[in-house]
Amino acid sequence: MKIIAYAVRDDERPFFDTWMKENPDVEVKLVPELLTEDNVDLAKGFDGADVYQQKDYTAEVLNKLADEGVKNISLRNVGVDNLDVPTVKARGLNISNVPAYSPNAIAELSVTQLMQLLRQTPLFNKKLAKQDFRWAPDIAKELNTMTVGVIGTGRIGRAAIDIFKGFGAKVIGYDVYRNAELEKEGMYVDTLDELYAQADVITLHVPALKDNYHMLNADAFSKMKDGAYILNFARGTLIDSEDLIKALDSGKVAGAALDTYEYETKIFNKDLEGQTIDDKVFMNLFNRDNVLITPHTAFYTETAVHNMVHVSMNSNKQFIETGKADTQVKFD
């Protein structure tokens, strides 16, 4: 049994090493580069591929994998929106993901960043750097006085709800697929418009689908309370970035914490020190005191990386042995 893993980072290698020791019957090849048309031939002779990347898995790459006899593909992440689904179906590829590598990791950072915005931490850091130790005018807000609207109440959304409740915030939620326990608590509102009208903080925990592309746009912002806070630790395409800038300029949005950006693949996880970033929209957001940007690192904890490697590799082994996997993704 042979599995090839692409785009293996240095920080992932210890977890691959652990998995290989636990599964001595599996031969594993680790490739540091992303899966592309140029290196897909490395998969020849392997039974499965374990992959991670934001870059698209194109029809060309998937067809070449299938031509090499590799029909079992395990993603070390949640999202499958960068897969060419028609090719997946046409070639009968088995796909698995890691549906919940660490909900707490993402929920914890979203709340952490919100607290920095509410406590004016970025502004105080600037003042302290200049030895300005005055308080005013940067007075803070308390989370326990606010209503938090959680869009998407899956594993991550529910972890965030628990943390927000711990701070004493009122929490309301919206999800097309409601959680039975949360529904018993009466937490859900019936429409997004209701959530926009009531929430002081809006946090996104939904996947990137056609139906929610730019779900936070000018129309959505217009329905929100003045001075709302926006948290996006899900997918960059959920927010129309230019409309967010306008909402920040008008004061409709008081601040935003973003761990994703719709054109992030050109920027995130790259060392751009001393270089000019020519994305004007990104730089507009990046240079604001009331916008906190992290480079898609909400997931990035030891627990999460361990789970990403072990769950994906276990699923690939299951595919090879049985043709099915616990985390198999079905495409209707």
Curated annotation (Swiss-Prot):
Alphabetical keyword list: NAD, Oxidoreductase
Tree of life domain: Bacteria
Residue numbers binding NAD(+): R155, I156, D175, V206, P207, N212, F233, A234, R235, D259
Top EC class for this record: oxidoreductase
Transmembrane segments: none
InterPro entries reported in the protein's UniProt record: D-isomer_2_OHA_DH_cat_dom, D-isomer_DH_CS, D-isomer_DH_CS1, D-isomer_DH_NAD-bd, NAD(P)-bd_dom_sf
Molecular function (Gene Ontology), one example: D-lactate dehydrogenase activity
Active-site residues, as the UniProt record annotates them: R235, E264, H296
Gene3D superfamilies assigned: NAD(P)-binding Rossmann-like Domain
Reaction it catalyzes: (R)-lactate + NAD(+) = pyruvate + NADH + H(+)
Protein EC: 1.1.1.28
Family listed: Belongs to the D-isomer specific 2-hydroxyacid dehydrogenase family.
Protein name: D-lactate dehydrogenase
Organism in which the protein naturally occurs: Lactiplantibacillus plantarum (strain ATCC BAA-793 / NCIMB 8826 / WCFS1)
Gene symbol of the encoding locus: ldhD
